[in-house]
Design a protein with these regions (language model features):
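Residue-level signal for pocket-adjacent positions within structured domains
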Residues: 12, 38-39, 71-73, 77-78, ...
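Glycine-centered flexibility sites
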Residues: 21, 35, 80-81, 103
Length: 123
C-alpha cells in the first residue's frame, strides 16, 4: 500500500488586510507540495456561525427573505447568524436567531452537522 503524501501547503508569508467584527481577510503566499508557489491566496475568517433548518408542524420549511448586497437582490435563505459570546451554546444561538428572524420558537431541536461554508478559503 502506498504511503499518503504530504498534501499540506507551506505558508511563506501571511498578513491581515482587514479585520472587522464579522469578517477578517488574510493574504498568504504559499508553496504547494509540488513546489509551485501561489503569491496571493486569500483566506476569509468568520466568527462561529449557525444555520437553522426549521420545519413547521405542517411540514413546511421556514425561510427568511432578506436583501443581500453581494447578490444585489432580495433572496430567500435559511435562518442564520453569529454565535454571540453570551449564548451558552450554538443551540442557544440557533434558537435565538430563529425567534429573532422568524418569530418561530420551541419545538424539537437537533444538531444535524458541523460543516465549513467553503473550506478552501473560509475558516
Amino acid at each position: 500500500m502506498e504511503t499518503p503524501k504530504n498534501r499540506n501547503w507551506k505558508v511563506l508569508k501571511s498578513e491581515y488586510l482587514s479585520s472587522q467584527p464579522w469578517f477578517t481577510v488574510r493574504r498568504e503566499e504559499v508553496e504547494l507540495p509540488n513546489g509551485n508557489r501561489i503569491p496571493e491566496y486569500f483566506i476569509f475568517e468568520y466568527p462561529e456561525w449557525i444555520n437553522v433548518i426549521a420545519i413547521t408542524k405542517e411540514q413546511k420549511f421556514v425561510f427568511v427573505s432578506q436583501y443581500r448586497h453581494g447578490l444585489g437582490i432580495t433572496a430567500y435563505e435559511l435562518c442564520a447568524g453569529v454565535c454571540e459570546k453570551e449564548d451558552a451554546s450554538p443551540l442557544v444561538s440557533a434558537q435565538r436567531e430563529l425567534l429573532e428572524e422568524t418569530g418561530y420558537g420551541n419545538g424539537n431541536w437537533s444538531e444535524l452537522m458541523v460543516i465549513g461554508v467553503n473550506p478552501s478559503t473560509h475558516t
